[in-house]
Amino acid sequence: MGALTIVAKYMIVAQIEVNGSVDKSDIIGALFSQTEGLLGKDMDLRELQMMGRIGRIEVDIFEKNSKTKAKIYIPSNLDRYETALVAALIESIERVGPYLANIKVLEIKDLREEKRRRIIEKAKELVKMIEEEILPDTKEIIEKLKEDVAKAEIVEYGPEKLPAGPDVEKSDSVIIVEGRADVVNLVKHGYRNVIAIEGISRGIPQTVIDLSKKKSVTVFIDGDKGGELVLRELLKVAHIDYIARAPPGKEVEQLTAKEIAKALRNKVTLEEWLAQQKAAGEKTEAPAQPTQQQPPPAEAPIQFPFDMSKKVEEMLGTLEAEIYDANWGLVKKLPVRELPDFLTGEGDSFYAIVMDGIVTQRIVDLAAKKGVKVIVTARVGPLTKVPEDMKIITFEKLTQKVA
């Protein structure tokens, strides 16, 4: 069907069969000539076409042998009654040239309905485009705005000028992460008491170590081996209260607000984390085991001047430490949290420490400098080096040995 020459409301579709071989022009000529004057001048096809009431008549011949079959398309700008009258008019055609003919109207299409359908379909496409293209762009703009605001709030903290959130100084707790991008992501989502160590290649910054002495500390690590390495280094020198971890394979800087909230909500204490590692086969501690040489210290005979099993019962749950001299005289009793500071201070050397806490690499290093030879403890954290002349034994192994 060719292009319409008017803005039509309706389309008359008819089929014609001619008992002979004819052309398009023959069929169109028959339509005009055989309907002329039948319904008066106002309904004459030629007059209607000249006034733009009907459009260009199209004929598509689809069979032409001894008989000719074709479809006729007549666009109409008349109202529905007049259009129906024109349709009935063309059915009155009986001949095309010398051949008998028969015309049957197949349908009268409401082109406005077709147009409405196309408009609706187009509207659906546009809505889909809005959802897929415009809305994501809006979200991206909002995320970019949040990130820019977060970056503007990042401060440089301490002599090392570590990237940190604006509330690190005044908050009672602090979240330690690895890098600046992690800080930006957490600040963007409302966590303003966060500070980064900026990697572990140059060691843990003293600023972070000092913060860990006076604030509740949560270490938020990536969900990969790199995160475990960061935690291992922190445990050597800093006081760690809680550990939060990103989902496996994800980094803290990549997390959404929901993922951050879930990870921090599911944080565990250091004791719980160590127990989980032990239950999982102590995978993160396995590489350090050969250098710890813990079995020999645990099995080596240690002479105590008092019933150590009773002492263990007394200390369980107190989170305290007791410092002894070479004659097993009590020098100091203090909370385990204050033990590193006490060992750092100036003073005489000591012989033994009994503590209801976790022995970290930092405690081992400080105790070694004070000449400590025996440490009796509730738990042993990840250690990389223990002096050969230092004996470390856990409450559990001690009670088993006594039993």
Curated annotation (Swiss-Prot):
<dbReference type="GO" id="GO:0000178">
    <property type="term" value="C:exosome (RNase complex)"/>
</dbReference>
<keyword id="KW-0804">Transcription</keyword>
<feature type="binding site">
    <location>
        <position position="224"/>
    </location>
    <ligand>
        <name>Mg(2+) 2</name>
    </ligand>
</feature>
<dbReference type="InterPro" id="IPR034154">
    <property type="entry name" value="TOPRIM_DnaG/twinkle"/>
</dbReference>
<dbReference type="InterPro" id="IPR050219">
    <property type="entry name" value="DnaG_primase"/>
</dbReference>
<feature type="binding site">
    <location>
        <position position="178"/>
    </location>
    <ligand>
        <name>Mg(2+) 1</name>
    </ligand>
</feature>
<comment type="subunit">
    <text>Forms a ternary complex with MCM helicase and DNA. Component of the archaeal exosome complex.</text>
</comment>
<comment type="function">
    <text>RNA polymerase that catalyzes the synthesis of short RNA molecules used as primers for DNA polymerase during DNA replication. Also part of the exosome, which is a complex involved in RNA degradation. Acts as a poly(A)-binding protein that enhances the interaction between heteromeric, adenine-rich transcripts and the exosome.</text>
</comment>
<keyword id="KW-0271">Exosome</keyword>
<keyword id="KW-0235">DNA replication</keyword>
<dbReference type="GO" id="GO:0046872">
    <property type="term" value="F:metal ion binding"/>
</dbReference>
<dbReference type="InterPro" id="IPR020607">
    <property type="entry name" value="Primase_DnaG_arc"/>
</dbReference>
<dbReference type="GO" id="GO:0006269">
    <property type="term" value="P:DNA replication, synthesis of primer"/>
</dbReference>
<keyword id="KW-0639">Primosome</keyword>
<feature type="region of interest" description="Disordered">
    <location>
        <begin position="279"/>
        <end position="300"/>
    </location>
</feature>
<keyword id="KW-0808">Transferase</keyword>
<dbReference type="GO" id="GO:0000428">
    <property type="term" value="C:DNA-directed RNA polymerase complex"/>
</dbReference>
<keyword id="KW-0548">Nucleotidyltransferase</keyword>
<dbReference type="GO" id="GO:0005737">
    <property type="term" value="C:cytoplasm"/>
</dbReference>
<feature type="binding site">
    <location>
        <position position="222"/>
    </location>
    <ligand>
        <name>Mg(2+) 1</name>
    </ligand>
</feature>
<comment type="similarity">
    <text>Belongs to the archaeal DnaG primase family.</text>
</comment>
<dbReference type="Pfam" id="PF13662">
    <property type="entry name" value="Toprim_4"/>
</dbReference>
<feature type="domain" description="Toprim">
    <location>
        <begin position="172"/>
        <end position="248"/>
    </location>
</feature>
<keyword id="KW-0240">DNA-directed RNA polymerase</keyword>
<dbReference type="GO" id="GO:0008143">
    <property type="term" value="F:poly(A) binding"/>
</dbReference>
<keyword id="KW-0460">Magnesium</keyword>
<dbReference type="GO" id="GO:1990077">
    <property type="term" value="C:primosome complex"/>
</dbReference>
<dbReference type="InterPro" id="IPR006171">
    <property type="entry name" value="TOPRIM_dom"/>
</dbReference>
<protein>
    <recommendedName>
        <fullName>DNA primase DnaG</fullName>
        <ecNumber>2.7.7.101</ecNumber>
    </recommendedName>
</protein>
<feature type="binding site">
    <location>
        <position position="222"/>
    </location>
    <ligand>
        <name>Mg(2+) 2</name>
    </ligand>
</feature>
<dbReference type="GO" id="GO:0003899">
    <property type="term" value="F:DNA-directed RNA polymerase activity"/>
</dbReference>
<keyword id="KW-0479">Metal-binding</keyword>
